[in-house]
Amino acid sequence: MDWTRILTNVAGEFFAPTTAAYALAAVGLNIHFGLTGLLNMGQAGFMLLGAYGFAIATIAGWPLWAAVLIAIAAATIFALILGIPTLKLRGDYLAIVTIAAAEIVRLVGRSTALTELTGASSGLRGNQYKDTFQDASPFDDGTWALGPFEYAVNASNSWWIRIVGWVVVGLACWLVWLLIRSPWGRVLKGIREDEDAVRSLGKNVYSYKMQALVLGGVIGSLAGILYVLPRAVQPDSMGRSMTFFIWTILLLGGAATVFGPVLGSIIFWAVLALVKLTLRDVVPTTFLRSEQIEQFGWIIVGVALMLLIIFRPQGILGDKKELAINAH
Amino acid sequence: MPTEPSPAATDARAAVAAALRDVPHVPGAPKPDPVLIADDVRRMFGGVNAVDVDHVEVQRGAITALIGPNGAGKTTFFNLLTGFDKPNSGKWTFDGRSLGGVAAARVARAGMVRTFQLTKALNRMTVMENMRLGATAQPGENLFAALVPAVWRPREKAITEQAEELLARFKLDTKRDDFAGSLSGGQRKLLEMARALMAKPQMIMLDEPMAGVNPALTQSLLGHIQALRDDGMTVLFVEHDMHMVRHISDWVVVMTEGRIVAEGPPDSVMNNPAVIDAYLGAHHDTDLGDDALLDDAVLEQLRTEDEEAR
Amino acid sequence: MRSAVLDPGGTTTPPLARRIAALLLLALTSVTLLLVATPARAQGPVASATAACVADAATGCIVGTLRTEAGEPVVGAVLNVVGPQGELTATSDATGRWSVAVTEPGEYEVTLDVATIPAGEALRDPANNPRTVAVGLGASAAALFPLGAPAAGGGGGDTGDEPSDSPTTGTDGGAAAVPTTPGSTGSGVTAARVAQLTVNGLVFGTLLALASVGLSLIYGTTGLSNFAHGEQVSLGGILAYVGTQLVGLPLIPSAIIAVALGAATGWLQDAGLWKPLRRRGVGMIQQMIVTIGLSMAISYVFQFFFGAGPLRIVTDTPTSVSIGPVRITTTTLWSLAIAAIVLGGVAYFLLGTRAGRATRAVADNPALAAASGISVNGMIRIVWTLGAGLAALGGVLIGLYFGATSWYSGGALLLLMFAAVTLGGLGAAFGALAGSIVIGLVVELSSLWIPTDMRYASALVILILVLLVRPQGILGRATRVG
């Protein structure tokens, strides 16, 4: 077994663009669930919408900044549409509506009726929309190696997307760090605990929940852009499973913490890569086909999610005394 | 010491008593200086009138007790007045402003702050965070201002000072950094009341402040409620235990089956046949208030225990 | 929502850990036994999988067929594929087909090694080699290299005539996993079509009701939104498939065994997982997230053993009968009759029997029910068993109705079940029945106006709209706040 190759690949997952995208999506979900107690089961919908908004605007010839703004606007409108009917209702309604809404985005996006806009189920190819992002890079084209990690500087799965991705993740963490310590974050924490109590103190709970939903959703849409930049916009790869992975990441790292989502994402992808690569090397393909190894990985994720939420709902970084898994 | 009536307290109580002297002891009686006036407030649950109040006024600066047997609709009436439930019909004004159909948060901002029967201390926040949350006019509660600490730090400092004063008054200052969930039931009641006071309300509405509180702390709570009145605040509180009420309230409103059946000063209400009927008729087993329980000797004993407990 | 706060002083209790470990072990053992008992199926694909790639939720395929200008397959041509997964190669087989399995979605650059194509053949569009295709997991993307004389006008016509990537399956997709029902193709609003779609909607709604009534009962008695209920439905279909196709039983005994085993999993789940969690005081939201993890684990276990493709419970073509303008298969008529009888039985159980009334009492007020001498845990056990059994029956009948079942057939319906339950009022069993019929009709009739592949979305839009105007559902009633 080639441990060097396996460990190098696993280490590559630590700072892969996908890891950054999932970390960012989990930061958004953390604002919903960790800070406010909102059960958003449709974070992948925000991501897909952001990805579509960015890609379609870019293909239409819009500059980079405008395409990003379109993604943000799409997520904002989506959050408002979801929040208006549900934020006054019980928490499980929001869960059902967000998961349904994310599914609607995916079903509409993959529908043949919109082929010209969204490319239907085959989606939008990356090189249709990644030029503006790659052109924004200050570096020269080519490849560059750091130790065993060699990637293109600007193209597709590049150093450039890694740098931008992790800078955005860092900024999002800084934002959460500021907000958690602010009076605004205190109101959210109160809402997570008992929204009636906060209402009785004169705070407009509905408005705060809406602000949290929009903010977390916008961060989710940026994560969507990050996620699709090194690949394609594929509606079926951004479905319910993606949301559940983000939840696992958040609960693994620790909800309501600043760095929990980042740590969770790194561990999630590294462990998954380790398990799959090792199995691929150890288990003969006559016993387990390669797709069965993939499926085995996801089975582990499902079981890990169950065990985590039962035995360590505060995750790695969380404080059990402070975390209430409450629905609003 | 809140349980010892101070001269100011006696004055305040006497002044309120004087103001209410000529008010007739009938349901819906008009008050000389009402802060809250409610008309035709009704709330149905599955065809049953949970609340059916024709008219009621609450005197400014007085402690008014809303009493009645279990299921009389007191809490529902409270929920309606504070915007936590919507009536089928009715309107009410608070300090001249109409508050019918206004959302709970805006009712609170209008100066009418409530507490809950089942204490809603925010258990996973510290006592100080609970207190700060009660404050108003904190610019940092705006999402964008929150990002610039310089904008909200000065106000935060003022809020913290105000909170520390209140905590000292409610003898919670030593618990400042403890999680609210670690406090005793009575301390949580005190915290909830102190937190409500952070907003400097005109009127405070307490839903069964004495429920589930041990006798020693009951005395201290009663003292705090009287002190609020002495500071000029209007207090409306729900209670179904009458002997708690008679020692501190200036005026008593009796509800049963959603209606107001009697009003008056405590002593007069206790002897009102409608009240006795309401209690005995509906709930024969309800303790009408065995005053032996709260005679002076017992009170003295409780007070001593209270002292020793500290 | 019932109290869903974590117990701050709660410490991990080893018995629960052991119990869960035991449960997982049990589950794993049973599926392993299943695997051992069915070597033909489980290992069948391996033999043929040397070249052909099967797309599933974790795998994407890049495929193509190479033919000479004369239409003969090109054998032994070598293709290089470079992308997120690194460098891969493929060789075309005797039919000219080649495929590459990727587990990392994204863009891949496919290069045809022109040195390996037969002499005298050339690429029709040399500018298109290498070409880039985007592939997602669960989809196949085609990279076609037409051979022949270079097209006139250079590369002007390289797009349009042949899509560079045309996915064939989308197993993660709800709509794609379920074949189109008879009569729903075609267009235009005609009376006959409306009649056909209405009947389809009623059938689909009735079958959906079998699944959603169980979901609603479980929610009603325990407060739990069970995201793994879809997998209970898939389980029924898959067990029936195992019975008919792998064990060789006739359909009816196989279906009965599937339902019985389905119900048994409900009993086991409550005994081994949910009851210990309730006793431990695990909050409702936590339990809901447990169901999400369970749903993920079970669905991939299905995929692990049975693959991502459709599984046909019966292989013979069903016979159809025509009633006026409406065509319906005899199997569907029987299914409808069975579903109606079973739903009637459930209604009788809830309204007419002591146990059923006790169940409703628990749903209404568990504390009061317990005080009246009803065993709350006993009732919850009955509800889990009943709900899982109903879901399994729904899975069998839905599998028959759509012609095939799959690892995802229940998962695709989960949101429609939630929509039905929410429409009917969360926790109201009869509401779930009414809600299912509405959802069935909405799904089928909406294809009169919107593309068929968006019809599931229409049901979900209805769900959101209903919440906007009547959050307590069609049959639910407003409850006292606070």
Give the location of each predicted region.
Chain B
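Conserved ABC ATPase "signature" region
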Residues: 143-175, 223-226
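Helix-to-loop junction immediately C-terminal to a conserved catalytic motif
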Residues: 82
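The feature captures the beta-strand-to-loop junction immediately N-terminal to the Walker
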Residues: 67-69
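ABC-family P-loop ATPase nucleotide-binding domain
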Residues: 1-42, 284-310
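A short, surface-exposed alpha-helical micro-motif characterized by mixed small hydrophobic
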Residues: 245-247
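Catalytic Walker B motif of ABC-type/P-loop ATPase nucleotide-binding domains
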Residues: 204-208
